[in-house]
Swiss-Prot record:
<dbReference type="GO" id="GO:0051301">
    <property type="term" value="P:cell division"/>
</dbReference>
<dbReference type="GO" id="GO:0007059">
    <property type="term" value="P:chromosome segregation"/>
</dbReference>
<dbReference type="InterPro" id="IPR002543">
    <property type="entry name" value="FtsK_dom"/>
</dbReference>
<dbReference type="GO" id="GO:0005524">
    <property type="term" value="F:ATP binding"/>
</dbReference>
<dbReference type="InterPro" id="IPR027417">
    <property type="entry name" value="P-loop_NTPase"/>
</dbReference>
<keyword id="KW-1003">Cell membrane</keyword>
<keyword id="KW-0812">Transmembrane</keyword>
<dbReference type="Pfam" id="PF17854">
    <property type="entry name" value="FtsK_alpha"/>
</dbReference>
<comment type="similarity">
    <text>Belongs to the FtsK/SpoIIIE/SftA family.</text>
</comment>
<dbReference type="GO" id="GO:0005886">
    <property type="term" value="C:plasma membrane"/>
</dbReference>
<keyword id="KW-0132">Cell division</keyword>
<dbReference type="Pfam" id="PF01580">
    <property type="entry name" value="FtsK_SpoIIIE"/>
</dbReference>
<feature type="transmembrane region" description="Helical">
    <location>
        <begin position="86"/>
        <end position="106"/>
    </location>
</feature>
<feature type="transmembrane region" description="Helical">
    <location>
        <begin position="50"/>
        <end position="70"/>
    </location>
</feature>
<dbReference type="InterPro" id="IPR036388">
    <property type="entry name" value="WH-like_DNA-bd_sf"/>
</dbReference>
<keyword id="KW-0997">Cell inner membrane</keyword>
<comment type="function">
    <text>Essential cell division protein that coordinates cell division and chromosome segregation. The N-terminus is involved in assembly of the cell-division machinery. The C-terminus functions as a DNA motor that moves dsDNA in an ATP-dependent manner towards the dif recombination site, which is located within the replication terminus region. Translocation stops specifically at Xer-dif sites, where FtsK interacts with the Xer recombinase, allowing activation of chromosome unlinking by recombination. FtsK orienting polar sequences (KOPS) guide the direction of DNA translocation.</text>
</comment>
């Protein structure tokens, strides 16, 4: 009881004395406490100038408050009464302002000199102070002590190089002071005793020691000469010297608005460079800081020794030995080939000489010609030169003619065109080379076949990872509707017959650039496989054992530049593998059509009526999923990322498999443009909802429908909607259709009615799976305030198209990567229950195709809306409340207490707090409104407490 009473008494006393000033002057004490801390909590460390400045500042502030609030506080009234009688109201204010300015000049003399151009001569102030003190001494008595002018402004000791000059100045001042003291002692102690003489000597010794301890201010020239060399060239040392001081010298250094000269608080022997190399390095650094036109040409020595890494020396030596061995093998093979070529040339020359000797004459046309061996040799040399310059196409045209070589035993033969034997020999050599080349080509084709088989095996393994997800989809034939015709595939456009040509040279170039860039960052490894898809090419890079995966992730921008790509995505590591996936966009991106997915065997063989087409994977195979297994889907993507195209493909894939009896759709489109094309199709449960208030009503009624279905399944003793429909088929009852709720823009709903929308989506996502109600929620802004923790926890399956920032990808996928997508339907899909991320490319369906399908469905059957989903439950509560005949609800008083205590007036909040139904909660809210406790709902549906 004492502490609160004491505090209240202090508060009242403070308010009585200072009035309005009592609310503000404690902040002045914070600054004073900081300055007191810097003075080591000793009042003796303050200069008289600072004490006078602090006192004048406090008094001038108090006087200003007295001028503005003359009737507030006893001290303020007293100060105002005194100064107003002397100076008047306006004069008191001007005097307070001038006194405040004077206090600032006293506290910050250097700042005032630089900024305000005000400089005070403190010697005059000291003379005024001395005159005032002597006046007081004469009036009240006491000794008139002479104060030393230099003592009022203590100066921090400075270490100087000019110690001799300082010592000389000290000796001069010491002699002057000692002479003055001796004269004072002689005048005052002529008739003193021996004791007084000894005391005077002690005082003399003390004063002499004090004079020796004092420093003398040096002029600016000596200060510049004495400045430390390291201080002059090192900003870090200057900062450290300023921060290392235990207490500052003046308030100008505490609040250092302008640059001041350094204070040498560290002995110079610790800062001075010890070696000549250090001084040269300082000169070099100073020279490099200068502009180019002032810079000197300093040669910086560069060590020629190679810096070898200390770690992995054995591995590096082994690698160097292997490289040397490989080079030696290549040189040995080249040497062997040269020996074989020389042997072949020698044999050919022997054959030519033998043929030249045996063939004495060679017929050209119808005439004889006798050629000597020398001429034959020259002709062979010329023919060799000619054939070397010929194109290699001659080898391909060898078999276009049949050269005839015969031994001539008679003088005449029919005129047949016979070529020179030398050319024939060369042609035989070319045929041998051609046969060898064909054999090597056949061997290369065999090896290429083996490589293709290996690549197909790797591709099959990659497909097997996606097939593991596709195998979870239930296989079988879907039951076709009897009284409804599903739309044919002819409404969808055929894909263009354009086979993707794999440019191996471009892929090899990208692999080389990738490995070269990684090698420059000292990351070893190799690309073990490459997959070419319709949109991206994936390189599987296996790093060395000593490489961290995080290092590769940090090089994403550098690899993007090296591969000359718009953006790349690095998956490190690929789940289930010891490799890193680097996905690079293709130069030509193929368009994926919806008809390709709907015609695929994966989509046709799926038994589930809620099979939706998601697109193609990175290899180019169709990828679908079952909405029942998801069971809800959260989609995010910026404008232009292909999000709306992907949602349209999902809707069309549902319409191609279901009649209105097996599937009903509820579309919520606050943007009013995306789903307007689907109006009046027979599958719609309500018209396309564009009003946020109607959307909240529809979601609340969907929760009521979920509860109704659970009651029906509980009565039928079934666990899910499939078993319930089978049982109703046997009993001849009414089946329950699947309901898919599609919300195109969640952010707009969260802005208008965030809490209610979050509550209803959370309830549907938690419980609606077994009742056959599924959600597809899309948003352009996947921030934390839109995709809240409740929504994110209950929507485990997510698709992210291209987003703007890494944090958005982290929110929607719990991983990075969506910011590096390409747009145009490029997306990442996280299946439920797995941590892997599948990259997909959404199919495209034009508006013309959608219009044809919608018109076909409208012609099949007219739409039947269920208007009960759009009714406002609050209006229902009003009608039921009017039927109460004035009787209040049993929980009326408790509800009134909850609303008044918590300050929340929503129906859903009261429903959760009292654990009652929605209708009863709405009735209680309406009763509170009629009784004047709550207001009518505003445009946002919120009520105020009256």
């Amino acid at each position: 009881m004492l502490a609160p009473g004491m505090g209240e008494w202090v508060y009242k006393a403070n308010l009585f004395l200072f009035g309005e000033f009592a609310y503000y002057y404690p902040f002045f004490l914070f600054i004073l406490n900081y300055v007191y801390y810097k003075r080591n909590y000793k009042l003796a460390n303050f200069t008289r100038r600072e004490l006078f400045g602090i006192g004048f500042a406090f008094f001038s502030s108090l006087l200003l408050f007295a001028v503005f609030y003359p009737n507030s506080g006893y001290i303020l009234e007293l100060a105002y009464a005194i100064f107003s009688t002397i100076l008047g109201h306006t004069g008191s204010g001007i005097f307070a302002l001038l006194l405040l300015l004077f206090s600032l000049v006293l506290l910050f003399p250097k700042f005032a000199k630089e900024i305000l151009k005000i400089e005070l001569d403190f010697t005059y102030l000291l003379k005024v102070e001395q005159a005032f003190k002597s006046l007081l001494m004469r009036v009240f008595g006491g000794e008139n002590e002479k104060e030393d002018v230099g003592k009022s402004e203590p100066i921090v000791p400075k270490l100087n190089i000019l110690q001799d000059s300082i010592y000389g100045n000290l000796q001069i001042n010491k002699k002057g002071e000692t002479n003055n003291l001796e004269q004072i002692i002689k005048d005052s102690n002529i008739n003193a005793s021996k004791n007084s003489i000894t005391t005077a000597k002690e005082n003399f010794e003390k004063l002499k020691n004090q004079i020796l301890d004092e420093t003398i201010e040096i002029d600016k020239q000596s200060l510049k000469e004495s400045r430390s060399f390291v201080h002059e060239h090192s900003q870090q040392v200057r900062n450290f010297a300023q921060k290392a001081s235990k207490m500052s010298i003046s308030l100008d250094e505490d609040f250092n608005f302008i640059s001041e000269e350094e204070v040498d608080m560290i002995p110079e022997r610790f800062l001075k460079p010890k070696k000549l190399e250090d001084i040269k390095q300082i000169d070099t650094n100073k020279n490099l800081d200068e502009p180019s036109y002032k810079r000197k040409n300093i040669e910086i020595p560069v060590s020629n020794q190679e810096v070898k890494p200390k770690i992995f020396t054995k591995e590096l030596e082994l690698r160097e030995n292997l490289i040397k061995k490989e080079k030696l093998e290549q040189e040995y093979k080249a040497y062997q080939n040269e020996i074989l070529e020389n042997k072949v040339k020698q044999e050919i020359k022997k054959l030519e000489e033998y043929d030249a000797i045996n063939s004495s004459d060679i017929i050209e046309g119808n005439k004889y010609s006798f050629n000597s061996p020398k001429t034959i040799k020259t002709e062979t040399e010329e023919s060799d030169k000619i054939n070397e310059n010929k194109n290699l196409d001659k080898a391909d045209n060898i078999f276009e003619f049949a050269p005839i070589v015969e031994e001539l035993n008679h003088p005449y033969i029919e005129p047949t065109p016979i070529k020179n034997i030398n050319e024939i020999v060369i042609e035989e050599k070319n045929t041998l080379d051609f046969i060898q080349n064909t054999e090597t080509k056949i061997d290369n084709e065999k090896t290429n076949d083996q490589e293709i088989k290996l690549q197909k095996a790797v591709l099959a393994k990659e497909i097997a990872i996606n097939q593991a997800l596709l195998r979870e989809i239930e296989q079988g034939e879907i039951e076709k509707p009897k009284d409804f015709t599903l739309p044919p595939l002819d409404f969808l456009a055929n894909p263009k017959e354009h086979k993707q040509e794999i440019n191996e040279s471009e892929i090899d170039k990208k692999i080389y650039n990738l490995l070269e860039k990684l090698r420059r960052f000292k990351i070893g490894g190799d690309v073990i496989s490459t997959y070419v898809g319709p949109v991206v090419t994936t390189f599987e890079f296996r790093p060395s054992a000593d490489v961290k995966v995080s290092r590769i992730l940090n090089l994403q921008d550098d690899l993007t530049m090296a591969l000359m790509a718009k953006s790349i995505r690095i998956q490190a590591p690929i789940p289930g593998k010891d490799v890193v996936g680097i996905e690079v966009p293709n130069d030509e991106i193929q368009t994926i059509y919806l008809r390709e997915i709907l015609q695929s065997e994966v989509f046709k063989n799926a038994k589930s009526p809620l099979t939706i087409a998601l697109g193609k994977d990175i290899v180019g195979n169709a990828f679908v999923t079952d909405l029942k297994k998801l069971p809800h889907l959260l989609i995010a993507g910026t404008t232009g990322s292909g999000k709306s195209v992907g949602i349209n493909s999902m809707l069309l894939s549902l319409l191609y498999r279901n009649s209105p009896k097996t599937l009903r759709l509820m579309m919520i489109d606050p943007k009013m443009l995306e789903f307007s094309i689907y109006n009046d199709i027979p599958h719609l449960l309500t018209p396309v909802i564009t009003d946020p208030k109607k959307a909240v009503n529809a979601l609340s009624n969907m929760v009521a429908e979920m509860e109704r279905r659970y009651r029906l399944m509980a009565d039928a003793k079934t666990k899910n909607i499939e078993n319930y429909n089978e049982k109703m088929k046997e009993l001849g009852g009414e089946k329950l259709p699947f309901i898919v709720v599609i919300i195109d823009e969640l952010a707009d709903l969260m802005m208008t009615a965030g809490k209610d929308v979050e509550f209803y989506i959370g309830r549907l996502a938690q419980m609606a799976r077994a009742s056959g109600i599924h959600l597809i929620v899309a948003t352009q802004r996947p921030s934390v305030d839109v995709v809240t923790g409740l929504i994110k926890a209950n929507l485990p399956s997510r698709i992210s198209y291209k987003v703007g920032q890494k944090i958005d990808s982290k929110v929607i996928l719990d991983a990075m990567g969506a910011e590096s997508l390409l747009g145009r339907g490029d997306c990442l899909f996280t299946p439920p229950g797995t941590s892997s991320i599948v990259r997909l490319h959404a199919p495209f369906a034009s508006e013309f195709e959608i219009e044809k399908i919608v018109d076909f469905l409208k012609d099949q059957q007219s739409v039947e809306y269920d208007e009960s989903f759009l009714k406002d439950q609050q209006s229902v509560g009003v009608t039921t409340n009017e039927s109460f005949d004035g009787e209040a609800d049993e929980l009326y008083e408790e509800a009134k207490r909850v609303i008044l205590e918590d300050g929340k007036t929503s129906i859903s909040y009261l429903q959760r707090r009292l654990k009652i139904g929605y209708n009863r909660s709405a009735n209680i809210i309406e009763q509170l409104t009629q009784n004047g406790i709550l207001s009518e709902p505003d445009a946002k549906g919120q009520r105020e407490i009256l």
